[in-house]
């Protein structure tokens, strides 16, 4: 019988640990373009999954038909090579299992990534790009992530990117109860941000979105005022803090707009926190007197401080991952042995 084949699975990508936000935004895939990217990558593997979040862009490949690095370079070029990691076989599976469990996140233990992995797999499956191996690995990763959250305290009182942004605003402004907050965007992250602002006591929240109906839907659900993006500069002078979490394909706010808003609120600064990737707040805002601009990379200190209380759960979480990956490898070896026996039987007929 021929030797058993190794796990034909790989991941290539970058994340917050290997690339700053200005590099991550170069790799980010625009909403709606995922299908086109998947179709392109399918030339390099029989099964392909794209995981694209604010802190990572990763390509998972099963049934490889070429070099993973070449596959990534074909879509993004070589400019990002110095920030990429490549894992194969067991290491690639372990990576996805840790990602789904929130162990590889900027915010360790965060729960949003579980849904993001599930949607990435469902997108691949819907396009016929997830077969036996990718299905098994993705399902195993999701199950392992669920176990980590239910059997350890890793996700207890976990801070998310959204809550870290609100905590940063509190550190800058003090109590937020009598402050006005403006949220740019109306998606999942914007909804989480509004939830945390409400929990922090903010009474006045303005939700600004390109589609006013979507802004109104979110404002009506959690409380707030809705505003179409075309009126952003009219309401901006009211805002003490701006939290941006939109998937806009360009900067929606520049230094000149912030300068004009500050002129209408003398002696009252504006704190702006951009948790979008790509960023939608122009970095030139930093040069405006009275404006204080932050991005995802500035949240690291808050995230690290929050992790201290949950650090004891990490060894238990990692043990669950090792056990789950071992189960995957046993399945793979059994499957390969069965395929090998069939091949021998067919050859002898």
Swiss-Prot record:
Gene3D superfamilies reported for this sequence: Glutamyl-tRNA reductase, N-terminal domain, NAD(P)-binding Rossmann-like Domain
Gene Ontology biological process terms, A to Z: protoporphyrinogen IX biosynthetic process from glutamate
Quaternary data: Homodimer.
Record keywords: NADP, Oxidoreductase, Porphyrin biosynthesis
Annotated function: Catalyzes the NADPH-dependent reduction of glutamyl-tRNA(Glu) to glutamate 1-semialdehyde (GSA).
InterPro entries cross-referenced by the UniProt entry: 4pyrrol_synth_GluRdtase, 4pyrrol_synth_GluRdtase_N, GluRdtase_CS, GluRdtase_N_sf, NAD(P)-bd_dom_sf, Shikm_DH/Glu-tRNA_Rdtase
Gene Ontology molecular-function annotations: glutamyl-tRNA reductase activity; NADP binding
Similarity section: Belongs to the glutamyl-tRNA reductase family.
Gene name in the database record: hemA
Reaction(s) this enzyme catalyzes, per UniProt: (S)-4-amino-5-oxopentanoate + tRNA(Glu) + NADP(+) = L-glutamyl-tRNA(Glu) + NADPH + H(+)
Residues the record marks as site: Important for activity: 95
CDD domains: NAD_bind_Glutamyl_tRNA_reduct
Pfam (any one): Shikimate_DH
Residues that coordinate or bind substrate: 53-56, 105, 110-112, 116
Enzyme class: oxidoreductase
Pathway: Porphyrin-containing compound metabolism; protoporphyrin-IX biosynthesis; 5-aminolevulinate from L-glutamyl-tRNA(Glu): step 1/2
Binding-site residues for NADP(+), renumbered to this chain: 185-190
Oxidoreductase in keyword set: yes
Other known facts: During catalysis, the active site Cys acts as a nucleophile attacking the alpha-carbonyl group of tRNA-bound glutamate with the formation of a thioester intermediate between enzyme and glutamate, and the concomitant release of tRNA(Glu). The thioester intermediate is finally reduced by direct hydride transfer from NADPH, to form the product GSA.
Protein name in the entry: Glutamyl-tRNA reductase
E.C. no: 1.2.1.70
Catalytic residue positions: 54
Comment field on protein domains: Possesses an unusual extended V-shaped dimeric structure with each monomer consisting of three distinct domains arranged along a curved 'spinal' alpha-helix. The N-terminal catalytic domain specifically recognizes the glutamate moiety of the substrate. The second domain is the NADPH-binding domain, and the third C-terminal domain is responsible for dimerization.
Keyword Amino-acid biosynthesis recorded: no
């Amino acid at each position: 019988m021929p030797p058993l084949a190794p796990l034909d699975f790989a991941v290539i990508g970058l994340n917050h640990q290997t690339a700053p936000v200005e590099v991550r935004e170069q790799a980010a895939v625009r909403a709606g373009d995922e299908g086109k990217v998947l179709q392109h990558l399918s030339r390099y593997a029989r099964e392909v999954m794209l995981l694209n979040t604010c802190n990572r862009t990763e390509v998972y490949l099963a049934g490889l038909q070429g070099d993973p690095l070449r596959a990534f370079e074909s879509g993004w070029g070589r400019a990002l090579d110095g920030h990429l990691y490549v894992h194969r076989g067991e290491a690639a599976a372990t990576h996805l299992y840790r990602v789904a469990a929130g162990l590889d996140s900027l915010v360790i233990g965060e729960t949003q990534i579980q849904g993001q992995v599930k949607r990435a797999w469902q997108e691949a499956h819907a396009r016929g790009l997830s077969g036996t191996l990718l299905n098994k690995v993705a399902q195993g990763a999701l199950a392992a992530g669920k176990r980590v959250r239910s059997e350890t305290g890793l996700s207890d009182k976990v801070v998310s990117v959204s809550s870290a942004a609100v905590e940063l605003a509190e550190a800058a402004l003090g109590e937020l109860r009598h402050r006005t907050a403006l949220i740019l965007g109306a998606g999942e992250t914007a909804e989480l941000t509004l939830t945390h602002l409400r929990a922090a006591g903010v009474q006045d929240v303005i939700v600004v979105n390109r589609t006013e109906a979507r802004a109104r839907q979110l404002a009506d659900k959690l409380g707030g005022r809705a505003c179409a993006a075309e009126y952003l500069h009219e309401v901006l002078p009211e805002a003490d803090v701006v939290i941006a979490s939109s998937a806009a394909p360009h900067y929606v706010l520049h230094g000149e707009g912030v300068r004009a808003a500050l002129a209408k609120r003398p002696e009252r600064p504006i704190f702006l926190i951009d948790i979008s990737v790509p960023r939608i707040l122009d970095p030139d805002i930093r040069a405006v007197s009275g404006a204080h601009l932050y991005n995802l990379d500035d949240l690291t200190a808050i995230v690290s401080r929050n992790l201290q209380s949950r650090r004891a759960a990490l060894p238990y979480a990692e043990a669950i991952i090792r056990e789950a990956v071992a189960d995957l490898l046993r399945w793979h070896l059994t499957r390969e042995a069965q395929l090998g026996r069939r091949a021998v039987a067919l050859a002898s007929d």
